[in-house]
């Protein structure tokens, strides 16, 4: 397993996450770990004019106390797709190349995804293509405990300096 790493699913993960995607030819994306709120699984942090801004994708509550990541459903509560897209536009519309990427990026906020894992994986694959990276992203077939692998899960943003959306 020296040529691959296991990463957790993440919504527009921090740059450290992508350095692992760059460093390994094969990356397993853990989809059988237990979902935890307030992690990068459904939260990203962007640089806004007023400082770091946390954007959170709402999820549906599961009847099961320990829902696996692949089964977490996205909720349409709060019109989050519209709110997130407007936050990206407000933060980056004057950035170089925003117009070049905006149409393709916007499709992630127009399309309804049922599962958070699917949304995160497709978005990660798109980001990788934009920066000329082609890692092999492979969803895990069963839970892989951290002790069995060189596992790196960037799971939780720091609550400091964050505003909620």
Stretches found by the model and what they are:
Residues 104-150:
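Hydrophobic, aromatic-enriched interface-forming segments
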Residues 39-110:
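A basic- and aromatic-enriched beta-loop-alpha substructure that forms the phosphate/nucleotide-
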Residues 15, 82, 86, 118-125:
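A structural signal for well-ordered alpha-helical segments within the folded catalytic domains
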Residues 1-36:
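Short, extreme N-terminal leader segments that mark the start of a protein/domain
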Residues 95-100, 133-138, 164:
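Short secondary-structure capping/junction motifs at helix and strand boundaries
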